[in-house]
């Protein structure tokens, strides 16, 4: 066992003495058992994590019963909703790398034999996955589960996005203070990751398709007793994974990655999933190109429409309709779309995991014969405005905006854009451009939920597009094109735009362009002053110097590799 490094032999007497002092060693016999890290992300600041302390307790109890010795440790976490619209959002994506590094540090420093990872919200799940693939020891994921959707006293179904959009409605005089307060009080009724197909739930659903989590992980509610049972089962499974030495890189093959993207496209997941999955692929040393996604999307039907694409369906409804397994089982009817032979943490293949799954409500999960659209709910756009690509959640775009040409309305930061939208500076037909908000320029590639919600709340969602080198919340809806690469801070073409330039978005053709010649773009870029970093000290300053483009997953540069060739 790896842990023998810190517990076996006379020379390790000091190590054993310290381990006994933790209280986790019940008897000397424990030194013969595998040491299992319970990697928790309990945090009283995040509603999706406020209940995880109890899940950690359950995990430790079950690991010990199954023959292991549990050691719980915590990671940091950021609530994207609370961090939205201020300096905090610049730390959100950057926190993913801190989480990955911290999990790596604890697991390697203490020679743990395996990990039970308990994440839930946006950056915590991918951060832990990146670490798992980097250190490559047996790991199983079991998330905290989604939040229930809310209901106002009048019976309206609401979620967090309803509150953001209500702010826009209130500022436009469309609703009063009483209605705003009613939505605020009702939207988030308890613990769990926000209730739609936002980034947290998207990643937790993808965990099943990747093979890292048990069936049900993505959809069983946080408050459902089955969630505790899932934790128990996962905590028992880790001991078997350690005994059989089944590691993350045994599970995450290129085809497992494609399975996850197929699920993502079928559910219209958050655009952030592309960013995170590319980063995960990098840690697994899988050769995967951003441009390959359109071909997969073209053969993946969009069969499960969930909030924010529709307020009629939330994750609890997907669970009731059969969950991720039912969606994957339905997709498996398409010849060659899924690789059902990929290994999972159950010890079985993906095909075996989903063999008995069935759709229980066709109004929630549609048949592949009657999809919402024949192609997936996410797409990658290319053109002279995004030579390295941009991402759009097609499933949340109004039909009227699938093709749009309009004049650019330029803002060099999100705050200015929000003021412009709220101040009636943006008119029907415009293309709002928010730039210098990429991984380097932001820094941290902040989400644009506040401006997109303001556009929707002010009734402009079917006439205004928004493009950015930043990113979007999984809750954003409308013609929102993000991750434009190269970013403005790297002198990408988006930095050459002037107010009034005509921008054409053609989602069916997967293109985004500006009506400028290459010569004009290059002349404008050459005339720009060097980019001046916005933050010059602390973690974000270091992050901005090391982060790469969105089309590579916004991973950090590794200037020196000590890995053997």
Curated annotation (Swiss-Prot):
Coiled coil: none
Alphabetized Pfam families for the sequence: ILV_EDD_C (PF24877), ILVD_EDD_N (PF00920)
Enzyme class label: lyase
Cofactor binding annotation: Binds 1 [2Fe-2S] cluster per subunit. This cluster acts as a Lewis acid cofactor.
Active-site residues, as the UniProt record annotates them: 473 (proton acceptor)
Gene Ontology cellular-component terms listed: cytosol
Pathway(s) the chain acts in: Amino-acid biosynthesis; L-isoleucine biosynthesis; L-isoleucine from 2-oxobutanoate: step 3/4; Amino-acid biosynthesis; L-valine biosynthesis; L-valine from pyruvate: step 3/4
Disulfide bonds: none
HAMAP family, per the entry: IlvD (MF_00012)
Protein name (database record): Dihydroxy-acid dehydratase
